[in-house]
Amino acid sequence: MSAQTSKSARRALVTGGSGDLGGAICLALGAAGFEVIVHANGNLAKAQGVAQQIIDAGGQAQAVAFDVVDAEASAAGIAALLEAGPVHAVVNNAGIHDDAPMAGMSAQQWHRVIDVSLHGFFNVTQPLLLPMARARWGRVVSVSSVAAVIGNRGQTNYAAAKSALHGATKSLAREMGSRGITANVVAPGVIEGAMIGQAFPPEAIKQLVPAARAGKPEEVAALVAFLCSDAAGYINGQVIGVNGGMG
């Protein structure tokens, strides 16, 4: 599914683009003029719905589905996208929770969360880098979490996976900065979404977040879209929180 593609349009891939936050990021990038590739791990129909919203607003979009943990599936999916030219921006938003205190956490819980957030980051980003370098322009934005900055009970796996992205991103910024490529991390706090009510009741949010409210997906998406813009070309290797003052 796609709209007519302008020859000058930059292309942006958003992994996990069919969820609440991912969808908001896709819409923001579409409004910023990118041709948006909305990725889903499995729910292609939902990704197509996000793509259609972008098209209905006058933008350009398509939907794709592959498992970011599967190296071969990711390589095939990325190769197919690169047949149409470089992907100029990638937003690594795919991630999962599988919470438990570490003393009671299974090896499967540990590995699965790290596989999606960390190995998925490599599987998707690595094959995009040389085409970006040849284009002399690129943006890599990875979505982390405040848990990676200050920690959170029951999330040693999630915090480990996301904080690993911080180090990888800072190193990548040094490797690719001379090629016009920036790499940054956005670390949201408590953000509104389908599951927020169960995990964080309103009174808990007021106690936990200095801003006394949950953030909106659009507030995170606005920062991601800015980091993908020309105006953010000198911001590189940074971890930027969007968390209402949590840390």
Q: What spans do the regions from the language model cover?
A:
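Conserved glycine-rich cofactor-binding loop
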Residues: S18-G19
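Conserved glycine-rich Rossmann-like NAD(P)H-binding loop of the short-chain dehydrogenase/reductase
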Residues: F34-Q48
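Substrate-binding pocket helix/loop in short-chain dehydrogenase/reductase
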Residues: P101-M102, Q109-I114, I205
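Active-site helix of classical SDR
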Residues: T125, A161, T169
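C-terminal substrate-recognition "lid" of short-chain dehydrogenase/reductases
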Residues: L129, W137, K216-V242
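Residue(s) in the substrate-gating loop at a strand-loop-helix junction
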Residues: S145
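Short, small/polar-rich loop/turn modules that mediate ligand/substrate recognition or access, typified
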Residues: G177, T182, I235-G237
